[in-house]
């Protein structure tokens, strides 16, 4: 039986192995520093989280700082600062422990819902060890990804408990976990959709032909028991019509709608939607979304050339769009055709659906895609893969030792790849140099390599990368700023003024996000004007610098009330 002491011990032992392997794999992050992108905004230069008091709590629940509303994430960082101050290792280890906890929760949720120990363990192991998730764990500012996933998994577990015996109290627990997840990061906004998939499989709450993917009578053999060895009594609840199950999700959908409104407002307030520098047309965003679905699939199968930042293409080639569309349609057709294996359809739709908020239809930032967006979506692919391979091996009557050996070899290969990917996070320079190398024509990466070299005292090398960044994307203001500062410091005030004027022109439409950059630019421009004897323009630049400082949103997190 599923609840026998022997099986419980096996599950506990596997959970321990899973957690231990995950922590051991990610333990090197204990020696890694904060990275330049967002870690300062979230921790090192954010005095609001550096005192765990009532003012910080109020600020966490009322701010849209960093273009997000995620109060539990802010409180998590505040607690970490209370424990570790600015020792980056402690913050990193918290992320590693949360990732290990999420892996164990995923194992537990799948096991309780399906009755399969081995398959559930393999899904959780792929989730824990796949290198695509390095970004979510090694980046301290991405704590929000880990927290939201934890609450989503708890909501899934609570929903299975509710489905076994629907009660208001049990449903309320699902709502609570969902609210906590949204207060950590709103990317789990697709939970109601995932729960409908959960109803279809593995809970099988959808009654007969009411399902949008109802099987013909001749195709329905073996569905309810895909030959599970044991099923918990708690799992068997009443079947309902699809309409009733959809109605059941209305409170969750209301929370999703509220979160969407808050998120859009926060992103627009922070200048993330459309970016402060460039916006892309809807056609380009649609084309990029289709291509990126295919790119995510390729990285799930062969996780090579992973990068911190993938630049958004200005033009997407129609051939790429056509091939990606054909692939997605083909895989969808296969999943529907083989829907008697419900896990295939559920896994595929999980992948497609959970990526919708992050696929770029609404532009948030300047990236085409991001490894961190795979943290939730790849779970669907892992489910389809593990259940599909296990059923195939069973049909072929392959020895369990062969399946176990192949699984172990795959996990070891992933651990090696993850360990290597983790080393790129050992410093800003290593991270951005790798990103520039594997992406190509990446102005943001070239600029960040330059900044990293500049901090290391290698100014001449840094200037080459700033020039590369400016050549790749003439609309990016940061390299012009750094080139201007270099000219100013090396006695070329006229050249410096030209660079500073470019920065101001490129950020003319800024709504406050780049006020800090503009303030620094005007300050250096004033010094350059003074060096040329132009006191009138120097005074004007000084006045404008002061005005920009009052618009600088980072000022809010660097001062206390």
What is the predicted function of each stretch?
Residues 226-229, 507-516, 558-559:
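Intrinsically disordered, low-complexity Ser/Thr- and acidic-rich flexible linkers and loops
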Residues 516, 527-561:
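Terminal, low-structured helical/coil segments at or just beyond the last alpha-helical repeat
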Residues 1-489, 495, 524, 531:
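Polytopic membrane enzymes that build or remodel cell-surface glycoconjugates and lipids
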Residues 438, 472, 506, 510-513, ...:
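Structural marker of alpha-solenoid helical repeat scaffolds
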């Amino acid at each position: 039986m599923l609840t026998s002491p022997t099986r419980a011990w096996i599950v506990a032992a596997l959970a321990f192995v899973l957690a231990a392997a995950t922590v051991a794999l990610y333990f090197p992050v204990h020696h890694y520093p904060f990275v330049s992108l967002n870690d300062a905004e979230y921790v090192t230069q954010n005095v609001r989280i550096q005192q765990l008091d009532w003012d910080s709590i109020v600020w966490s629940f009322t701010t849209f700082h960093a273009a997000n509303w995620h109060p539990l994430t802010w409180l998590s960082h505040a607690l970490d600062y209370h424990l570790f101050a600015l020792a980056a290792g402690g913050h990193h280890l918290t992320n590693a422990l949360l990732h290990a906890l999420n892996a164990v929760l995923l194992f537990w949720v799948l096991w309780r819902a399906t009755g399969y120990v081995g398959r559930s363990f393999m899904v959780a192991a792929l989730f824990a060890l796949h290198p695509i998730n390095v970004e979510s764990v090694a980046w301290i500012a991405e704590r929000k990804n880990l927290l939201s996933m934890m609450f989503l998994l708890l909501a899934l577990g609570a929903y299975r408990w509710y489905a076994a015996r629907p009660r208001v109290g049990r449903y309320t627990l699902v709502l609570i976990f969902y609210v906590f997840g949204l207060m950590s990061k709103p990317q789990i906004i697709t939970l109601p959709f995932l729960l409908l998939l959960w109803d279809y499989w593995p809970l099988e709450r959808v009654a007969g032909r009411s399902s949008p993917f109802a099987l013909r009578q001749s195709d329905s053999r073996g569905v309810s028991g895909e030959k599970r060895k044991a099923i918990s009594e708690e799992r068997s609840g009443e079947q309902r019509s699809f309409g009733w199950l959809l109605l059941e999700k209305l409170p969750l959908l209301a929370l999703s709608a509220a979160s969407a409104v808050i998120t859009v407002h926060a992103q627009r307030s922070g200048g993330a939607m459309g970016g402060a520098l460039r916006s892309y047309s809807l056609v380009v965003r649609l084309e990029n979304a289709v291509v990126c679905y295919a790119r995510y699939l390729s990285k799930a199968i062969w996780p090579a050339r992973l990068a911190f930042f993938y630049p958004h293409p200005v033009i997407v080639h129609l051939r790429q769009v056509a091939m990606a569309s054909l692939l997605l349609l083909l895989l969808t057709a296969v999943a529907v055709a083989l829907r008697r294996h419900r896990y295939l359809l559920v896994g595929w739709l999980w992948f497609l659906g959970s990526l919708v908020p992050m696929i770029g239809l609404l532009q948030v930032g300047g990236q085409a895609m991001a490894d961190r967006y795979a943290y939730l979506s790849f779970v669907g692919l892992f489910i389809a893969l593990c259940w599909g391979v296990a059923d195939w091996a069973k049909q072929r009557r392959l020895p369990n030792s062969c399946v176990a050996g192949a699984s172990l070899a795959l996990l070891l290969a992933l651990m090696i790849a993850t360990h290597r990917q983790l080393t790129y996070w050992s410093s800003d320079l290593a991270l951005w140099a790798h990103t520039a190398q594997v992406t190509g024509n990446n102005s943001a990466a070239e600029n960040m390599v330059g900044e990293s070299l500049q901090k290391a005292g290698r100014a001449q090398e840094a200037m080459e990368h700033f020039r590369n960044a400016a050549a790749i994307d003439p609309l990016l203001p940061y390299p012009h700023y750094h080139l201007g500062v270099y000219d100013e410091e090396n006695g070329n005030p006229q050249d410096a003024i030209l660079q500073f004027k470019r920065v101001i022109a490129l950020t003319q439409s800024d709504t406050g996000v780049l006020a800090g950059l503009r303030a620094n630019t005007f300050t250096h421009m004033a010094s350059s004007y003074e060096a040329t004897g132009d006191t009138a323009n120097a005074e004007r630049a000084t006045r404008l610098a002061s005005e920009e400082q009052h618009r600088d949103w980072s000022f809010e997190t660097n001062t206390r009330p």
